[in-house]
Amino acid sequence: MAKKKFSAGLTVLSCFLALVIGFAAAFFLYTYIKRPTGGDAYISGDLSIHFMELGNNYTGDSIYIKAGDTDILIDAGSRADSTDTTAAYIDQYCTDGVLEYVIATHADQDHIAGFAGSNSSPSMFDRFTCETIITFNLTNQKMETASGNPTLYAKYVDQLQEAVDAGATHYTALQCCNNEDGAQRVFEVSDGIEMEILYNY
């Protein structure tokens, strides 16, 4: 009788260990071997949200949203040279070259560097036709360095103005929240999909 208990216990333990090893192997394969490159994508019906890898070793934010036929870019990453990778990723989904909405959440480098661009890597404003640009209302960023050179923020402002001169409509988040000057707090971006602009300053 004691032998049966030992055999049953050993069988249960063996099954449990096999299960744990199987889960660990599957996790390892997905995480380190078969994981798709380019960032994470979440898709539901006509809405897909892509958290993009930026093509460099720096952290930064850049989110692409596809809502029906509407293309939305939120922030443009950590370095100006990340626009090559970011634009190539977006081009897979944005086939007409038009970003209906571009949003810059705040003026820190890890959010606006791709909008500023560089000599070797054009701004996201140059790479796509931008229809509506929504930006932060306040910043403590300076236009010049102590030595008098333009800052990244100054380059961003120049690129933003060029996009507006090329036909983009520009609103601040505060204008959107207050429904001022043609701005809206809520934009219908696709059938049944709305984008609400929040203002938290």
Predicted ranges, named:
Residues 16-20, 71, 161:
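N-terminal hydrophobic or amphipathic segments with adjacent small-residue motifs
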Residues 1-2, 30-34, 101:
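Long, low-complexity, intrinsically disordered N-terminal extensions of eukaryotic proteins, enriched
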Residues 2-19:
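N-terminal Sec-pathway targeting helices
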